[in-house]
Amino acid sequence: MSVTPEVKSRGMKFAEEQLLKHGWTQGKGLGRKENGITQALKVTLKQDTHGVGHDPAKEFTDHWWSDLFNKTAANLVVDSGKDGVQIRRLSKETTQRSHSKPSLLYQKFVKTATLTSGEEKPDRDLESCSDVDNREPIPPKILTDEMLLKACEGRTAHKAARIGITMKAKLARLEAQEQAFLARLKGSKDVGTSQPLTDSEPSQKKKKRRKQKEEEEAATTEKSLGEELLEHTDKSFRKSKKKKKKKKDEREGTAIGSEEEEAAGVCGPAELSTEQSDQSSRKKKKRRRRHHEEEEEMGVCDEGGRDVTGGPKAVNSGADTDPWRSSKKRQTCEEDLDTQDEEDKDDLTKKERKVRKKDKKKRQQYCEEVLDVSNKDDGRTWEAEDGGERSQPHPKARAKKKKRKTD
């Protein structure tokens, strides 16, 4: 039969390691005399109410009465002599338990007196106790200073006083200070009782003076705050003036832009931080797009007769013009300028309006020049923009050449 080795738990292994460090070996018992247990207690699954290490078969295997009889018999010695038989004990150990009777003072009623026909009859024990108390007074446990002096025969912790060195001068000085302090207190009380009315008048005057001082301090603080506010407003006003000047210079610089930006109706955008500035910039972009589309439809040309789109230029070959057509174009240009100015009036300041008036005049001049060029379209000849490039014939001439080739 093969014996299965015991599987030791982690706790058992740790306990064995600790015991081995201290010189224990397997098979030895615990304790100084090595008479303790040799095997560790093992806890199994409990399904009863018994405690740990309980042996249910102990009551059948442990014969305690026989052990007790043998122990008492061994302790007794029987001596037989002339006078008879004597029993003697070897040890003073008692085989019986000494059951001490508990005191019943706080468990039951204590009898102190008996009542006989409505009269109290005290016990003799109490009377004897009272007589003893009257004869010998019990000294207190905590002694007073006087009792300590008597017991120590007038000695104190000041060892120099035993030789004769005392602090009479210091004690006299302290007593004089205390008397002077008490005299001052008594004098102040007497003055307070004798003159209650005279003290009330100066107290009212003091209150008035305090109020006046507080009012003066409040006035001075208000003045200082007012001066600080004025200085702050002056500085902010100066800063705003400087900012306005800078903005004005920027707007004038943008207004004197290139001719192409003027043709497209470009104006220097005023950098505004509010929501109105954002709305005005959006409106300007829409107007520029419209203006560009109208110029492309009308075939706007610049001062030199060059088309804005960069295509071939038309040169006037005759003096014939259409007055009705030119007047109509001028009206449309003027209406566009008026609508732009009316929409911008609400969002602009006085300084910006002046700048816009200058721009309006320049636009009007440019429109008049463009219209003068566009009215001369009856007899035109098509040429290249640059002199070095090849001249292009009129589209009608091209059509005639194609017909000739086909014939």
Curated annotation (Swiss-Prot):
Could you tell me which residues carry Phosphoserine?
A: 128, 130, 258
Return any one Pfam family short name: G-patch
Q: Acidic residues bias: where?
A: 334-346
What terms describe the molecular function in GO for this protein? nucleic acid binding
Q: Name one GO cellular component term.
A: nucleoplasm
Q: Which residues carry this modification: Phosphothreonine?
A: 4, 116
Q: N-acetylmethionine occurs at which residues?
A: 1
Work out whether the entry's keyword set contains Mitochondrion. Answer: no
The organism's superkingdom is given as: Eukaryota
Q: Does the keyword Cell inner membrane apply?
A: no
Feature: compositional bias, Basic and acidic residues: 118-138, 224-237, 374-392
Q: Where is this cross-link: Glycyl lysine isopeptide (Lys-Gly) (interchain with G-Cter in SUMO2)?
A: 46
Q: Please name the GO terms of the biological process aspect recorded for this protein, alphabetically.
A: hematopoietic progenitor cell differentiation
Query: Listed disulfide bonds for this chain?
Result: none
Biased-composition ranges, Basic residues, are 238-248, 282-291, 351-364, 393-407
Q: Where is the composition biased (Polar residues)?
A: 191-201
Every G-patch domain range: 11-57
Q: Which UniProt keywords apply?
A: Acetylation, Isopeptide bond, Phosphoprotein, Ubl conjugation
Which stretches does the entry tag as region Disordered?
A: 116-138, 187-407
The record's section on PANTHER family has:
G PATCH DOMAIN CONTAINING PROTEIN (PTHR23149), G PATCH DOMAIN-CONTAINING PROTEIN 4 (PTHR23149:SF9)
Question: How is this protein named in the record?
Answer: G patch domain-containing protein 4
Gene giving rise to this polypeptide: Gpatch4
